[in-house]
Amino acid sequence: MDELAAVTEIAAPDVGANQHRWLIAIAVMLGTGREMVDTSIVNVALPHMQGSFSASVDEITWVVTSYLVANGIMIPLTGWISARFGRKRYFLFSVTTFVIASACCGAAQSLDQMVIFRLLQGFAGAAMLPSSQAIMMETFPPEEQQLAMATWSMGLMVAPVLGPTLGGWITDNWSWRWNFYINVPIGILAILMVYTFLEDPDYLRPKRGAKVDYLGIGMLVMGLGLLQLVCDRGQRAVQIWLVERRHSQS
């Protein structure tokens, strides 16, 4: 019986020992909330961005498409990357990269620059959603996990709803560029809080030397990227093909 208890204790993660758990919750929700807001905040600013970059309606939609494609590629890889490099380290890297990419998006001088920086922003932001959920479950004891996850879920549901309203207000009163600059101070606060209070659980450390399936990762990235691209832009391609076919038959 004692041996079984010992094995169970080793196998199960040490959950709920962190006395700063609500500060950690605020930190991860700051990062994740900004990522969720950014999925919708730029939609209302697209006409203003279109004028700044002298882009067509079809071209400016790549600002949204690039972000969604990068998100779709990176989300499935988050668990493996967290296990290999550490959840705290990866989350800090993601938030830091997201902040830098946001500042670059705000300073972009062409559509090409904006699309590249939005790709970088999407790659970085993708890690925050699954990582923050895992961090919440590992930080809170079992008796508080339901409350913690309810709070986390509420924040994630509110963030995309606030995005268009906040984006419209910022664009009208300041500039569309501030839809990205606003991420910088919030992101820096999240970085400082995560660095100060968050620690990796012990059960993740033995997994950092695992073998890497580079072929599998490459196929996953290619497949998910193309699938996301088809889902987002496929209808447009079909419409163009139908128009060209109609002209060729007439």
Model-derived segments and spans:
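Hydrophobic transmembrane-helix bundles of small-molecule transporters
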Residues: D172-S250
